[in-house]
């Protein structure tokens, strides 16, 4: 899949993005927001990148003006607790995402999701879309609410609380 917005190219992640990805997740604040350990051995970011490469729908977000990866978007099957999953329609998608710290607060992720979400409903037959964020990740919560996601449930993960936001 190739998708384009006013400022972004959204492309399947490939080996060419590895260096930018490793640089991008070097910031401990991003690691914490995403649930990675704030301190990690230098061998871990490449391992995370290669794990993402193994996913069917792992996308690199590239700013057109820079031509460099500024973040990522992952589209996976939902991994929600059974009691939460039971009340939802079939064919759900979970989106996980991050914009690297040097490019945050510029609307890039909102722009990417505004393009990708309608695509999932129109072409992917999505019954719903799920995004989770930690309770202390206020920017993600505010952005998701602008995109008409609503809090559906909460559950514990890695000694923190995840808020499950759903878009129908």
Task: Pin down the residues of each PLM region.
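Acyl-donor (CoA/ACP) binding surface of acyl/acetyltransferases
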Residues: 1-33, 58, 62-168
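Short loop/turn motifs at secondary-structure junctions and domain boundaries
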Residues: 50-55
């Amino acid at each position: 899949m190739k998708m384009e917005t006013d400022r972004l190219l959204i492309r399947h992640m490939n080996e060419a993005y590895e260096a930018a990805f490793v640089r991008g997740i070097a910031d401990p604040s991003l690691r914490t927001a995403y649930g990675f350990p704030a301190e990690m051995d230098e061998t871990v970011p490449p391992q995370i990148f290669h794990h993402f490469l193994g996913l069917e729908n792992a996308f690199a977000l590239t700013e057109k003006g820079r031509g460099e990866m500024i973040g990522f978007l992952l589209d996976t099957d939902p991994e929600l607790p059974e009691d939460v999953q039971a009340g939802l329609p079939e064919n759900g998608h979970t989106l996980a995402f991050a914009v690297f710290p040097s490019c945050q607060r510029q609307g890039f992720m909102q722009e990417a999701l505004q393009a990708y979400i309608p695509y999932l409903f129109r072409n992917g037959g999505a019954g719903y879309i799920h995004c989770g964020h930690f309770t202390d990740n206020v920017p993600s919560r505010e952005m998701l609410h602008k995109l008409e996601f609503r809090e559906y449930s909460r559950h514990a993960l890695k000694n923190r609380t995840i808020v499950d936001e759903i878009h129908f």
